[in-house]
Amino acid sequence: MKVTDKKIEGCQASITVEMDPAEVEAGLSKTYRRLVKKVEIPGFRKGKTPRDVFEKYLGREKMLDEVVDDIVPEACQQAINDDEEIKPFAAPKIAMVTTEPFVFSARIPLPPVVELGDYKTIRAAKEKVEITEENIDTVIDQVLHQRATWEKAERPVKMGDMLLMKVESTLNGEPYLNREDMQYSVREEAIYPAPGFGEHLVDMVVGEPKEFSIVFPEDHARAELAGKTAAFKVTIQEIREEKLPELNDAFAHELNPEFNTLAELRQRIRENMQERQDDQAQAKFEDQIVEALIKMSKIDYPEVMVETELDQIIEQQLQRLQSTIKSPEEFRATLSQLSPADMQQRYRPLAEQRVASSLALGKLATTENLIPSDEEVDAEIERLTQDSGDKKEEEKAFYNKPDTRDRLIQLLTARKTMAFIDEIALQPALEAVEPKSDEGEKTEEADK
């Protein structure tokens, strides 16, 4: 085996390896012993077919394809181990070049490299947000809608109504959506079963069917719907309208027995909103700091780190989407418009930012020795379990499990690192230092 080509660019090494005929022959023998036990050949018992007959039956090209799994991963690892310059960060990606001669290539991710900028010069301002009466009114309005009841309405359909209806439809003449008693919330932003469907329902009355058509846009995310015409026939069976509760002291007390007046409810909302706004302002402040740290630093990392982070982000987004859309049909319709390629393109910048942020802050933590001591970790476990009562020792044992304790160390490290750089960023702005003139330098020399 010999490495015929090697390149190291950034955090990736690329090698091309040609294997000796003897190595390939040994691999073919191994492959034969593996396959002969599985493949039945007429005239021979399974596992007893002579090798020459077996290879002729299977074909040399097929045998060489099969031998890849038997010898290439091990050969690739050996080539990496023999090269002192290559320190793999993750598993290599291997591709065959040719089978005769037997040549493969591999791309090997290398560890990330971080060179921090002058982070002690970072400065940022923390935003202060005041809660207004209008902000409180908005929250109360949301609470009223959450506590609303739905009452039968004897009038035409309006936006915001909840309907029970019969739907018959075709898509370019083929059956599309057909439901006998479909519940439907009339909302302008709804895209199911077709964009603008809810607007066609406005002013309809119970028992009077209506027929209408909707043309899906040519650039619709679902290729099977793009440009096609959906013909609907809808019959409203029941209309329900939202009835909001009366806003008074009794409503506040019913919402929470701690409140005797509406004013007390409003004060609690103000406090909660202020706390959330302060948290958001802190998060925005820290985002600015981290962005500045990334921008002033030199950070290089292997692509596999972004790919892993991107997969996690997409999985989280899909779970969040599923939790917010209650209707299975609407979830499937929404999901069908989110192609994997589109989602990867949309969330890739976020994945790249998270990787860079993690690497920069991690480097800062080691540079400034911000890794928590055992005593600090123990103190945090004590704080987390102080209200556990009889289960305190059980919970302490849980936090002291290696995996859980490691996660706690990561959390405390991140907390200490952000606190460290927060303190730097809140310091007064640095004053620019004026360069000394030649005349000034001469005067200083004369005074010496």
From Swiss-Prot:
Keyword Cell cycle in annotation: yes
Q: Give the originating organism.
A: Dehalococcoides mccartyi (strain ATCC BAA-2266 / KCTC 15142 / 195)
**What is written about domains in the entry's comments?**
Consists of 3 domains; the N-terminus binds the ribosome, the middle domain has PPIase activity, while the C-terminus has intrinsic chaperone activity on its own.
- Name of this chain's protein: Trigger factor
Q: What lineage does the source organism belong to? A: Bacteria, Bacillati, Chloroflexota, Dehalococcoidia, Dehalococcoidales
Role this protein plays: Involved in protein export. Acts as a chaperone by maintaining the newly synthesized protein in an open conformation. Functions as a peptidyl-prolyl cis-trans isomerase.
**Matching InterPro entries:** PPIase_dom_sf, Trig_fac, Trigger_fac_C, Trigger_fac_C_sf, Trigger_fac_ribosome-bd_bac, Trigger_fac_ribosome-bd_sf, Trigger_fact/SurA_dom_sf
Q: Which NCBIfam families match?
A: tig
> For this protein, what reaction is catalysed?
[protein]-peptidylproline (omega=180) = [protein]-peptidylproline (omega=0)
Main subcellular localisation? cytoplasm
Q: Which GO terms describe its biological process?
A: 'de novo' cotranslational protein folding; cell division; chaperone-mediated protein folding; protein transport; protein unfolding
Q: Please, which domain of life does this record's source organism belong to?
A: Bacteria
EC top class named in words: isomerase
